[in-house]
Amino acid sequence: MRERAKLYIDKRVDQSDGSILEIVIWKLPNPTAERPHGYKYRLNYSLPDGTTLVRYDNETGKGDHLHIRAKEYPYTFTTPEQVIIDFINDIKNNEGQL
């Protein structure tokens, strides 16, 4: 029987201003070439219309990266805890520009 990914965290918060904060992290059964750290993740802070303000993800074919509005930057994933800290810090640090 093939091992399945295990949900590490799945959290969504609908903010009073209508923005959405979502954190989803999966622990993969085994590391892969694209995800050598063994995690698949999506951390997203967006407007109600879906416009991305801050997003961290490792979508297939792109590897670890982050988005601040429409700009994309490389990201070095270390741990699930650290990616959450980095995500929250980017929201706070870019607050006036988002």
Language-model features and meaning:
Residues M1-H65:
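The feature represents the first ordered module of a protein
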